[in-house]
C-alpha cells in the first residue's frame, strides 16, 4: 500500500538573518512529495476560533522529489500572528492527496520592531483587523431595499455588522485622524489612514476588511524607514527572484533577466 509522506524538522526553527525564520526540513515519499507547507497554530487559541490554522508554502526543489532535505528562509514578520507564541508543524502532501505531519514545535513568530509612532499605530490597527477570526453578521432584510435611500442606509450600517475587533480598528482610525490634518504633518499619512477607515466602513465581509493589510503595512514601513522602505522592498523582490531561479536550475542569462525584471 502507498504510505503517507513523511516530514520532519531536521532541527528546531530559529531566527536567521534579516528577521527571517530558518526552517531546516526533511521529506520523503515512495512516489514523491508534491507540496510542503508550514502549519501555524496559536499556542493559546482564540476561543472564537479554537481550530484556526494558517499554512505557509515551503518551496520544493524539483517536481515531486521522493527524498529531499533543505533549509528554507521564510519572512514571517508580516504574518498576522507575528510576535505571538505559536506551534509549527510541517505538512507534506503526495500526488494521491495523502498528508504526513511532522512533530509539533513551539516557536514565537518574529515581529518587526516599529519605533515611529505612526508606524506603530498602523501596525496595531492592521493586526487588530487580521487577528479577528469572527465573521460579519448578516444585514437585516429590508422590504424597501430596492429604494436608493434604503440602500444608502444599509451601506452606512455595515460597520455595525462587523465583528468586535474590526469595529475597534475603525474606532482607532477615527481617533488617530480626528482633526488629524492639524497635527499629522504628512498629508499622505493622513489620507492613508482615512482610506483605511473608508475600507472598513464599506466592508461587508472579512476579505473586504482585510484589504487594509497592504495599505497599512506599506505605511508602517514608510513611516519607520522613510524612502529606504521602497529600496528594501525592491531588494527583497530581487532576493526572492534569485532564490526561485536557483531552485528552477535557470541558466546564468535567465538569472540575469529575472533579477533585472
Regions inferred by a protein language model and the residue ranges of each:
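Extracytoplasmic/secretory ectodomains and luminal regions
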Residues: 1-261
Amino acid at each position: 500500500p502507498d504510505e503517507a509522506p513523511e516530514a520532519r524538522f531536521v532541527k528546531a526553527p530559529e531566527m536567521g538573518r534579516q528577521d527571517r525564520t530558518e526552517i531546516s526540513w526533511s521529506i520523503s515519499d515512495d512516489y514523491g512529495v508534491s507540496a510542503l507547507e508550514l502549519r501555524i497554530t496559536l499556542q493559546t487559541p482564540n476561543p472564537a476560533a479554537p481550530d484556526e490554522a494558517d499554512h505557509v508554502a515551503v518551496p520544493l526543489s524539483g517536481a515531486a522529489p521522493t527524498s529531499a532535505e533543505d533549509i528554507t528562509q521564510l519572512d514571517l514578520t508580516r504574518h498576522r500572528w507575528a510576535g505571538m507564541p505559536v506551534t509549527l508543524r510541517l505538512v507534506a502532501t503526495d500526488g494521491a492527496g495523502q498528508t504526513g505531519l511532522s512533530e509539533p514545535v513551539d516557536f514565537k513568530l518574529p515581529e518587526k520592531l516599529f519605533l515611529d509612532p505612526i508606524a506603530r499605530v498602523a501596525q496595531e490597527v492592521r493586526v487588530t483587523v487580521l487577528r479577528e477570526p469572527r465573521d460579519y453578521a448578516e444585514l437585516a432584510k429590508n422590504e424597501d431595499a430596492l429604494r436608493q435611500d434604503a440602500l444608502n442606509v444599509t451601506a452606512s450600517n455595515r460597520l455595525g455588522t462587523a465583528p468586535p475587533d474590526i469595529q475597534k480598528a475603525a474606532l482607532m482610525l477615527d481617533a488617530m485622524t480626528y482633526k488629524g490634518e492639524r497635527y499629522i504633518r504628512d498629508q499622505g499619512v493622513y489620507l492613508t489612514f482615512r482610506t483605511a477607515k473608508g475600507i472598513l466602513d464599506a466592508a461587508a465581509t472579512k476579505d473586504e476588511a482585510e484589504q487594509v493589510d497592504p495599505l497599512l503595512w506599506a505605511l508602517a514601513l514608510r513611516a519607520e524607514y522613510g524612502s529606504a522602505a521602497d529600496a528594501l522592498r525592491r531588494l527583497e523582490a530581487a532576493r526572492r527572484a534569485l532564490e526561485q531561479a536557483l531552485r528552477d536550475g535557470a541558466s546564468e542569462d535567465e538569472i540575469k533577466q529575472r533579477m533585472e525584471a
